[in-house]
A protein has these predicted regions:
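Bacterial N-terminal signal peptides that target proteins for export
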Residues: 1-6
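Bacterial N-terminal signal peptides
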Residues: 7-15
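Sec/Tat signal peptide C-region and signal peptidase I cleavage site
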Residues: 16-20
Length: 182
């Protein structure tokens, strides 16, 4: 019994030590953009949508959240991670947080992309002066459906469902943080 306990303790200590050396910046990155593999998969999915071509060509930059998880029963929340691009290169990582109240039920996972029309809009995001108010909304992209939207206050937001079902699909109340890569 004691020998099993010691073996388990030793194994646990070794696994903690090996995971402590993990560096997320060393994960597989695209050599052209510097983006993570997860971000590149999401970027490819958004670039495959013809209606977004003009946004990719004309935007000064964009924040791409490869996975946003959202759920709630009355009180809800969302959290996501992504990266910020400008001139085809990754500037740094971004995170998204949201807390919401009201009638909502369920859970979902989705991707989100925020296009910044001008440099000042990208700068506003990377300097930490950016959040969506309670009335903000995004365009949900569905296969085979026409996408018609324009910039509002220098940004255009699109989401792509990954899975789940949730009554309530606003982006209101989202707050963001940005951390530049060195």
């Amino acid at each position: 019994m004691i020998q099993r306990l010691l073996t388990l303790l030793l194994f646990s200590a070794c696994s903690i030590t090996s995971s402590a050396a993990w560096d997320p910046m060393q994960e597989s990155r695209d050599p052209d953009t510097g983006a993570s593999k997860k971000t590149m998969i999401a970027l490819k999915a958004f670039r495959a949508i013809p209606e977004l071509k003009a946004f990719f060509e004309q935007a000064n930059g964009f924040a791409l959240f490869h996975n946003v998880a959202k759920g709630g029963i009355g009180i809800g929340g969302a959290s996501g991670k992504g990266e910020v691009f400008q001139s085809g290169q990754v500037l740094g990582s971004a995170s998204l947080k949201q807390i919401s109240f009201g009638f909502q039920f369920g859970g979902q996972a989705f991707r989100e992309i925020i296009f910044f029309k001008e440099k000042q809009d990208t700068d506003r995001f990377t300097e930490g002066h950016f959040e969506f108010g309670a009335q903000a909304s995004a365009v949900l992209i569905k296969q085979g459906v026409s996408v018609e939207t324009a910039y509002s206050n220098g940004v255009a937001v699109f989401t792509m469902a990954k899975g789940g079902l949730m009554y309530e699909a606003s982006i209101g109340g989202q707050k963001f943080s940005f951390k530049p890569y060195d």
